[in-house]
Amino acid sequence: AIISARNLHKSYGNNPVLRNVSLDIFPGESVAIMGPSGSGKTTLLHALSGIIKLDAGSVLFNGPTGQVAVESLSERERTSLRANSFGFVFQQGLLVPELTAEENVSLAAMIAGVPRQQARSISADLLNRLGLGQMLDRRMGEMSGGQAQRVAIARSQVNGAPVTFADEPTGALDSKTAREVMALLLTMIPQQGKTLLVVTHDPNVAAACSRVVYLQDGQIVSDQRNSQGGVPAQNGFQNLGAQSQAGA
């Protein structure tokens, strides 16, 4: 497993958000994390990526330089881990609107320690692969939501991250653009042997993933392989998605 989580507990005040959660994530998987609002989906993503400190439990990351016990790292070490080993894609992209597409992606590369000229080269290559080769110098405010998410995907891959965490990456997009963005995520990440974890309410996003983990009240109640990932009309996850949306 590239990530092994055991007995994760997290509370905010008197409200338990994760309760004894354990799971293994493997290289090349695309894992959808579903569940009603308040079920602990985003908290689980934040726990696995070291964004938050757990109350109890362990997260082991088996990266290129060896095994890392994420929960034992200092804040500075966790920040370094995220910059160098993990990629992130969020619902709104969290891009700098005053910068161009190329500058947004290059900035992330330089934060990860890549020299400026090399960062620009990596950025241009990624944006070209995502169909934005003619938009390198366009500012984010001049781009559509789908184009901005493509920039966010490029930014998430500048460090060659073995694991990418995506939190509702298609939530602000229309259905056609959402399908395109999800297809790009799968092409850029699991189809390259890397790992993708996606928090989503969208059953079509879940259908495109190789595995669906469903949370309820901070616990995993279902963990299923999807033998027909990428075929939304012929999969077993619409019911899970409908439950998720009904509980939102």
Regions found by a protein language model. Give the residues of each.
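Short coil-to-helix segment of the ABC ATPase nucleotide-binding domain corresponding to the Q-loop/switch region
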Residues: 99-108
